[in-house]
From Swiss-Prot:
In the N-terminal section; belongs to the glycosyltransferase 51 family. In the C-terminal section; belongs to the transpeptidase family. This is Penicillin-binding protein 1B. Signal peptide: none annotated. Residues 392-684 are annotated as: Transpeptidase. GO terms for molecular function: penicillin binding; peptidoglycan glycosyltransferase activity; serine-type D-Ala-D-Ala carboxypeptidase activity. SUPFAM superfamilies: beta-lactamase/transpeptidase-like (SSF56601), Lysozyme-like (SSF53955). NCBIfam families: PBP_1b, PRK14850.1. Its EC number is 2.4.99.28, 3.4.16.4. Gene3D superfamilies: Biosynthetic peptidoglycan transglycosylase-like, DD-peptidase/beta-lactamase superfamily, Penicillin-binding protein 1b domain.
Amino acid sequence: MFFNFKKYFLIKVFFFVLILTLCYGLYLYVKINRFINGKVWNFPTSIYGRIVNLEPGNSYSQKEVLHLLKSTMYRKVDLVMLPGEYSIKNNTIEFIRRAFDFPDIREDEFHARLYFNKDTLVKIKNIDNNHDFSFFRLEPKLIAMLKSPEAKKRMFIPRNQYPEMLVKTLLAIEDKYFYEHDGIHLSSIGRAFLVNLMAGRTIQGGSTLTQQLIKNLFLTNTRSILRKINEIYMALILDRFYTKDRILELYLNEVYLGQDGDEQIRGFPLASIYYFGRPINELNLEQYALLVGMVKGASLYSPWTNPNLALKRRNLVLFLLYKQKYITRKIYKDLCKRSLNVQPKGNIISSHPSFIQLVCEEFHKKIYNPIKNFPGTKIFTTLDYTSQNAVEQAVKIEIPILKRKKRLKDLEVAMIVIDRFTGEVQALIGSSKPEFNGYNRALKTRRSIGSLSKPITYLTALSQPEKYHLNTWISNYPLSIKLDSGQYWTPKNNNFSFSKKVLLLDALIHSINIPTVNLSINIGLKKLVDSWLLLGISKKYITPLPSISLGAINLTPFEIAQVFQIIGSGGYKSSLSSVRSIISDDGKVLYQNLPQSIHIESSEASYLTLYGMQQVVKSGTAKSLGTIFKEFSLAGKTGTTNNLVDNWFVGIDGKQIVITWIGRDNNHTTRLYSSSGAMQIYKRYLQYQRPVPLVLKAPNNINMFYINNLGELFCKKNNQHNRMLPIWSIKNKKICNDKLSERFSIKKKKNFLFWLKNLF
């Protein structure tokens, strides 16, 4: 009787435990199913640089295209066979462009050969079909990945796009019975149990890849019997209801492979980019071995922090491949001789923090929601890697030189590079240490702009062709102006010299203060303020005082860039932008920037002002720049404020406008003039970013005239006329002083034929 009772009791307990186990298994199945069939990961927002469009006739030199390829980690080889490889022969570059999901369409690999003639791309040939191409684009560089809510970064690649050599290496080291077991491997568990029992502590694991995946996706790192039971049970469920390739795909994209600051590097695709700078399918076997070796302990075997341990671990992986007959002894020996050859930490995905701040600000304005609500988005920006690199190199070289010369420790800098016509921001830094994230002076620092304000005064005057031309005389007498406060303001020239009068153009070329103030008084303070407002400066930053003509207005480098974009493009405003398009994680276009220009300033006055700025570089305050880059006809303007607190330079070539500011955060003197400070950084920039000649095309109402020493215009040259100026006038007949010129003469012979001609 007792025996039967015990028997029935045990049966009941058995079925109770069985039912409980099945119910718990059902719960785990639902949990796994919902997770894996749903959205497994929230990917971080990826930010890309500019997509480079190549067309025959582009002003791209062979050297510049090589720099673009190297920046995206293309590898030089003798014979191009794989994506990401290139070769050079004479005036050609042959390479296979990687497949890439562009904002509008996915483009496959493309085998191309580019032909160059001097500094111009002349032909693009498709090697596969031997046809010429009229248009071709390079994949952009990944410049940043924004923080994800889970503090994990990854890039997803489907199982069929993983190289088989990587998969074989992983399985050989971590789970060689993966395709045979049912999620767990009992002999491995038993072996690990005995080893740990004998050691008295946990020193060996018996987990399969499936178990490791379960732990990464669902469990914690806490070591306990209960956690191990859950791990085994869930591994059995996962293996029963999902294919081996799906499990492997999840593992390859989930495994922990290092740290980037406070964020984890997850998955082989992103680890490949971080450590080697190239996609996972372009790596060599020894590089796969390093990554697979890091699975055991990414922190311990990090090639950045523990290179010797990482090398030993990599070579051990290679040895195991040799022992399992995946490679020969010779290959094993050869591969072990190779260095780790990893990229310096932060060298590949270098975020350019100042530029990224601008991108994020624009992102929030365009999308209207916090960035965390858009995981996995791709932001395609306007950042030109060549220009950004040139800016950073110029600052890293010149700022230490200037600090040593002036014995300063706290000299700061901001630079912004924009496309002259579209207003796209191609490069930006806000600190003397471009790689550090912090206060962005390019966007936030509001400083007196000094003589950078003068071109706006001359632009305002030249917008009135009935009154002002480049040959207009302006008073250079000392003056004192009584302000509304009752005080007197007495401007002075920099060299404390004065003269009776000076030509308007010469006052701009040599940045003379007194004529500029006199000109602002003559044109009227209201018109000058209206010009600033028209150029996009907020009224709250404008104080309507005569000193505004000499720079008594505080602006940011970003605002200054917008002002000179309008002047530099002939009076057309294109709002500055850093974002071209934003694509959601499912491929939908969330935002597309279509650059639009608004004609807000006189084309003639803008042309004349820009012409004057060309003469500044040719023979004025920026003459030393013009001497070095004479063939490029650059335009520019220096700007230095009182007590040498701030110094500025704006440089303009055929395609870019560059604003440079140097100052100190405590507003103390820099002991630098613009020509010896900001302009020197611009000079250095041009050594890394080859300028394009600035060729000005005069509007129809502007013609070139000769000028004599009295500033009088002539249509024909003689011994007294040694200078030519562009003049805006619809009534050309009333400009010239030539007595022999019938077309342009002021005093014409009014004979019958002349009268008859004018009658009709």
